[in-house]
Amino acid sequence: MSNNIPLTKESYEALQEELKRLIREERPKVIQDIAEARSHGDLSENAEYDAAKNRQGFIEGRIQELQGKLARAHVVDLTGLKPDKVVFGATVTLYDTASEEEITYKIVGEDEADIKLGKISCTSPVGKALIGHKLDDSVKVKVPAGTKEYEIIEIKYE
């Protein structure tokens, strides 16, 4: 199993920005907050100090997490791909044969998935089922509610 984490360019850049913000802004601020809380005296009953230390732990943990993800990131370049096959990063419009409705999903990495924004993980049942299929293919997907059948009516790389 590969340790690479597939990411869209947008997601990679967003993670980089979050890391920069945490290092440049949040880390110095929490260090200042700890110093200020320490100056209030007794640390054993100092809620401000405890809160600042907890926040520092969260920030440092998130920094490590982001550094690890970015080090293992594989940015998927969709430039020049013909929109005839579903791959990671594709935006796919499906026709649900049961409900007779169209639905559009962008296939993204696990960290990027947000169903409210129409972004599904490449490891989700629908994402896994779609990858590798072509325009006009019929795809059956086992979901918790049963089996869904979709027809791929459009593939775009945005």
Curated annotation (Swiss-Prot):
* UniProt xrefs under Pfam families: GreA_GreB (PF01272), GreA_GreB_N (PF03449)
> What's one GO BP annotation on this UniProt entry?
regulation of DNA-templated transcription elongation
Q: Name one GO molecular function term.
A: DNA binding
Q: Which residues does UniProt call coiled coil? A: 1-67
Record-linked InterPro entries: GreA/GreB_C_sf, TF_GreA/GreB_CS, Tscrpt_elong_fac_GreA, Tscrpt_elong_fac_GreA/B, Tscrpt_elong_fac_GreA/B_C, Tscrpt_elong_fac_GreA/B_fam, Tscrpt_elong_fac_GreA/B_N, Tscrpt_elong_fac_GreA/B_N_sf
Annotated signal sequence is: none
Which controlled-vocabulary keywords does the entry list?
Coiled coil, DNA-binding, Transcription, Transcription regulation
Membrane-traversing stretches? none
Alphabetical list of HAMAP family matching this protein? GreA_GreB (MF_00105)
Describe the function of this protein: Necessary for efficient RNA polymerase transcription elongation past template-encoded arresting sites. The arresting sites in DNA have the property of trapping a certain fraction of elongating RNA polymerases that pass through, resulting in locked ternary complexes. Cleavage of the nascent transcript by cleavage factors such as GreA or GreB allows the resumption of elongation from the new 3'terminus. GreA releases sequences of 2 to 3 nucleotides.
In the record, the note on similarity to other proteins reads: Belongs to the GreA/GreB family.
Q: What is this protein called?
A: Transcription elongation factor GreA
Q: Which species is this UniProt entry from?
A: Trichlorobacter lovleyi (strain ATCC BAA-1151 / DSM 17278 / SZ) (Geobacter lovleyi)
